A protein has these predicted regions:
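Short S/T/G/P-rich N-terminal loop/turn motif that feeds into the first structured element of a domain
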Residues: 19-85, 94-98, 128-130
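Bacterial N-terminal signal peptides
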Residues: 7-17
Length: 130
């Protein structure tokens, strides 16, 4: 199997459906936080890193998104800190339903397909609710 194709499959499997919870009903009253940690195809590439950051900030135009933050890693010598990634993205939503809507929104889908997938080799997503 082509290694690039495998990376794309892994990327899609983490980024798109990682936040969906089967048939469980979303909590409609609590803020939801969505943290996306990205490793670039070309680790340390400043242009690619900036592109991911800029594209991510555009997610603020999606209804239900309260806040979007994106930035680069802070290198650290501390053992507990994983500073192997390139970019982290943080989004907050009004509730779980808005997170699900964001994942399927055309702006998000287009950004993932056209701009992020070509630049990112690995993604890890953390979702939590207050």
């Amino acid at each position: 199997m082509n290694i690039k194709f495998l990376h794309i499959i892994i990327f899609v499997s983490f980024l798109l459906p990682a936040c969906q919870q089967g048939k469980r009903q979303p909590d409609s009253t609590s803020n939801v936080h969505h943290v996306v940690v990205c490793w670039l195809n070309e680790h340390g590439n400043k242009e690619a890193r900036q592109k991911v950051i800029e594209v991510s900030r555009g997610f603020s135009a999606i209804p239900g998104v309260i806040d979007v933050r994106a930035g680069r890693v802070i290198p650290s010598e501390r053992e507990i800190v994983d500073s192997s990634f390139d970019v982290a993205i943080y989004l907050s939503f009004e509730n779980e339903q808005k997170l699900f809507e964001y994942l399927n929104h055309p702006i998000h889908k287009k950004a993932v397909e056209k701009m992020l997938k070509p630049l990112v080799r690995k993604v890890v997503v953390y979702d939590f609710i207050e």
